[in-house]
């Protein structure tokens, strides 16, 4: 097995081998990125089984579209982008995006996390966001998309994207305050 792994010294060698239809390279891609990409899919699709299905569909799309990878930029970034798009298509197909169409343009609040909060706790808070808020928050804060790109991907206006992000941040800040308050009560008891 180590011989197989050493054949693909970097992500570009791996991509080239996949473009040539090399099954071992496809396996290697899956082994290398499955857990990361499942985490990406899970940010958009809460149900674990559905997130796994989305991830598998994403890998199938990668294998179908591998010739479109132009060796400019990160291969992992290209893979991640496909996974995000696959998750968004799944959510759209299930009509799970319930976006507030009021499109009130609000400037994002300054968003500060308590240094005491654990990453796992924060991920749970993000997962508890209403679907529309969660989608925009993940795309903007985690994936790094612009409001224009988010608007195009979700079929909403830029103003709605900004509003959803602002509301997601306010929601998370409120959860953080509640968390800090309950932690202080525990420490003072």
Segments predicted by a language model, with ranges:
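C-terminal edge and immediately downstream basic/flexible tail or linker adjoining helix-turn-helix-like DNA-binding
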Residues: 1-8, 17, 152-155, 169-189
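Internal acidic/polar
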Residues: 7-11, 89, 96-124, 146
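A short, charge-rich alpha-helical start-of-domain segment used by transcription regulators
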Residues: 15-39
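Sigma70-family region 2
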Residues: 19-20, 46, 56-74, 93-94
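Structural recognition of an alpha-helix C-terminal capping motif at a helix-to-coil junction
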Residues: 39, 53-60, 73-85
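Arg/Lys-rich amphipathic alpha helix in sigma70-family domain 2
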Residues: 67-71, 81-101, 167
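DNA-recognition helix of helix-turn-helix
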Residues: 84, 88, 142, 154-178
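A short pre-motif secondary-structure segment
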Residues: 136-140
């Amino acid at each position: 097995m180590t011989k197989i792994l050493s054949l693909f010294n970097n992500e570009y060698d791996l991509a080239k081998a996949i473009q040539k239809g090399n099954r071992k390279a496809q396996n290697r891609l899956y082994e290398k990125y499955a857990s990361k990409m499942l985490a990406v899919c899970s940010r958009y699709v809460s149900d674990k089984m559905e997130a796994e299905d989305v991830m598998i569909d994403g890998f199938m799309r990668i294998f179908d579209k591998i010739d479109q990878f132009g060796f400019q930029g990160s291969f992992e970034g290209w893979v991640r982008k496909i996974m995000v798009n696959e998750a968004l298509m799944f959510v759209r197909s299930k009509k799970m995006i319930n976006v507030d169409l009021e499109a009130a343009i609000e400037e994002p609040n300054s968003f500060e996390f308590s240094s005491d909060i654990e990453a796992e706790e924060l991920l749970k808070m993000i997962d508890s966001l209403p679907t529309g808020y969660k989608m925009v928050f993940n795309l903007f804060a985690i994936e790094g998309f612009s409001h224009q790109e988010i608007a195009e991907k979700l079929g909403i206006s830029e103003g709605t994207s900004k509003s959803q992000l602002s509301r997601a941040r306010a929601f998370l800040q409120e959860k953080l305050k509640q968390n800090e308050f309950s932690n202080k009560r525990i420490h003072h008891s």
